[in-house]
Amino acid sequence: MRNVWLIVPFALLAALSGETWAQADRDLYIDSTESSGNYPVDDDDYSSGSGSGIPARGDDEDENVVLTTVQTLISSPSSEMPYVETTTLKTQTKMAPETKEPGEVESTNTVLVYGKKDIVQTATHTENLFHRTEVLAAVIAGGGIGFLFAVFLILLLVYRMRKKDEGSYDLGERKPSSAVYQKAPTKEFYA
């Protein structure tokens, strides 16, 4: 029975590692369709597939892409009305620059559709940077650490000032010469 418990983890490890190697082999040759080396003579016309993924256009119009998520919410769960989430892509050209306060982020438009009633609600709101809990927690933690550091620095300065008053530091006073101290005669007694 003990041997079975030792063999099962090794077999499981071998099975999982073999699966990841097979997955790595599939990912190795992603761009195999264009690997023949037969490119056009004019290299400027050829797109290598690397870069941002935005195709180059002849016109210089500024286009902004707005991503809108449409969610169909069902009032009661049933098999007749499945949950559907679709994403539509809209393009807008030459938007005027908006002035925003620093630290504010605008959220995306969301459209909610409920069942067959087709009630459409759109919501746009701005979010201040300090309303996010992780930013607020980081600011509070940084303030606490800074406060502790300041208290430690003040305590260190007070400690050094007290030690200086006690006389344990060399304050630049002259020490008496070694001639002032006389060596006591040493007498040796042998028994």
Curated annotation (Swiss-Prot):
Q: How is it modified after translation?
A: O-glycosylated; contains both heparan sulfate and chondroitin sulfate.
What biological processes does GO assign it?
Answer: cell migration
Q: Where is the signal peptide?
A: 1-22
Q: Which residues lie on this side of the membrane: Extracellular?
A: 23-137
Which spans are transmembrane here? 138-158
Q: Where is this region: Disordered?
A: 32-60, 168-191
> One matching Pfam family, short form?
Syndecan
- What does this protein do, in the record's words? Cell surface proteoglycan.
Q: Which residues are glycosylated?
A: S36, S48, S50, S52
* Lineage of source species: Eukaryota, Metazoa, Chordata, Craniata, Vertebrata
Name this polypeptide is given: Syndecan-2-A
